[in-house]
Amino acid sequence: MALLCLDGVFLSSAENDFVHRIQEELDRFLLQKQLSKVLLFPPLSSRLRYLIHRTAENFDLLSSFSVGEGWKRRTVICHQDIRVPSSDGLSGPCRAPASCPSRYHGPRPISNQGAAAVPRGARAGRWYRGRKPDQPLYVPRVLRRQEEWGLTSTSVLKREAPAGRDPEEPGDVGAGDPNSDQGLPVLMTQGTEDLKGPGQRCENEPLLDPVGPEPLGPESQSGKGDMVEMATRFGSTLQLDLEKGKESLLEKRLVAEEEEDEEEVEEDGPSSCSEDDYSELLQEITDNLTKKEIQIEKIHLDTSSFVEELPGEKDLAHVVEIYDFEPALKTEDLLATFSEFQEKGFRIQWVDDTHALGIFPCLASAAEALTREFSVLKIRPLTQGTKQSKLKALQRPKLLRLVKERPQTNATVARRLVARALGLQHKKKERPAVRGPLPP
């Protein structure tokens, strides 16, 4: 397999293999043609994230950006059509150098979203400066559920009505076989109109004509009140049944949505991230997209062979968090407080005005300092520290790496090391005298 050249430098065999696998992953994602899906990569080094961004630039329909902070920073791949335009008009995280020739050899097809024509000189198919999304960036879940509930209530009333009809619509009265018993629907409609007001009763009386061509006699008028009362009871009972069915359906739908949300958090949420970290990660992803209802898809690529070993909190046990001190204190003041450990190599790394990291040369020194009490400040293990302090420590693992202690030596070993460094030769031992020639 030929090695790829990036920025005038050939990639190593491992990076070349990584780029080819990323291309296969992006090809598979592009074939799905689902705008609601985004591809989320695991935390990788800055070099591998850069290779992903440069590889994504070869796909005109895809866009890439990064989310997260520190060693938890991750790369996201999405479709170009749902990417929020950036302030400089480019959707990618990096701009191609001006010396490199452009990879675009013509305008791309304009998106079929009814957008206005792109002005001349602007790149077709991409967002340009001044363009704003056609839909709001974020719609609260409460409003979305209210809209869904409104649509669900109308569909429930239509679906649960007998024979596919709404009993409250008077237009359905008289339809069908004229010989059938239609007195009950007609009287029920009339009963509901009586509840509305006496003024509207006379207007709806012609609805009784389809029942029979002959007017009602005195005998039928005498039993009219009983039938109206029965029809009214039937209508109220049907209405209560509809309301109970609607409430039960909405409750089931709400429970189903909550279960789906929990499953999405369990399945899509990375195992290394807590629920709060995953919610922040999801919020940061949706802030970069015009489509808020998205599905996060994990990559099928096994990056374990490419991922560098990331530092953990257990590797930083010699680091403590210094807190609860006056903002006016300076580095010299903190070092003076830990003067006993300064000779061994104690260092200070600032987080903010009231928090700092104390880096001890060994675990024993850190454990000894934790047992003491200081008057002007407090200390605690990094595992119990604030989120900002942990992030600061994990961002600079080399700076916080435990320093190896110098091996003990003596004067003889020191002289030998100095002599070797200066290139001095040891005195050669005298060789024994050469024997004379052997007799013939």
Swiss-Prot record:
Molecular-function GO term, any one: nucleic acid binding
InterPro entries attached to this UniProt entry: Nucleotide-bd_a/b_plait_sf, R3H_dom, R3H_dom_sf, R3HC1/R3HCL
Lineage: Eukaryota, Metazoa, Chordata, Craniata, Vertebrata
Official protein name in the record: R3H and coiled-coil domain-containing protein 1
Residues in coiled coil: 242-300
UniProt signal peptide: none
Domain R3H per the UniProt entry, residue ranges: 16-81
Compositionally biased region (Acidic residues): 257-276
Protein keywords: Coiled coil, Phosphoprotein
Location of region: Disordered: 154-225, 254-276
